Amino acid sequence: MQLINNIMQNLKGKTALVTGGGRGLGKAVALALAAEGVNVAITGRNENNLKSVVAEIESKGVKSSYSVFDVTDKKQVFASLEKLQNDFGKFDILINNAGIAAFGGILEMDEEQWEDIVKTNLFGPYYVVKAVVPGMVEKKSGDVVNISSTAGLKGNALTSAYSASKFGLIGMSESMMFELRKQNIRVTTLTPSTI
């Protein structure tokens, strides 16, 4: 119990970015971090959801902000996160949560939809890492949590696009862990089941 208390005390006053923070798992993580005294910025595509979550976060006595963008748009990601970091400060914690899912047979799924899933679930986190992690390297400290899925551990019928994107995210995370650990940056992958 003492170890858990020490970890929680170490979170107080830190800054976190949660992508896909307007609903679901991202919202839950953002609120949990805020409850531990972490200042939390969130991103997503629905401004009304983001505004509502920011109000909930701020009600916990911490600072919060949001930015509306699509993680598949590299220019939006870099411009929005540069502005957020100028206003909010460099992030100590990155939760790469934004993602989408659609299911269908590999021969039936439309190529554009297949590509969109991979762009959102793999390129999106990559763009966010490229925008945020240099600040962690500069500070020689940080935590990156990439949200993958059990579908990234084992493929199944009708999950080719989703599984490919989540397998890729696990591989990216593992490589990042080896690359960044010398700068005191921890990289973790979570693999939840269906949410």
What are these regions (language model features)?
Residues 22-24:
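Conserved glycine-rich cofactor-binding loop
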Residues 129, 165:
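Active-site helix of classical SDR
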Residues 107, 154-160:
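Active-site loop immediately N-terminal to the catalytic Tyr-X3-Lys motif
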Residues 47-48, 68-80, 111:
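The beta1-alpha1 cofactor-binding region of Rossmann-like NAD(H)/NADP(H)-dependent oxidoreductases
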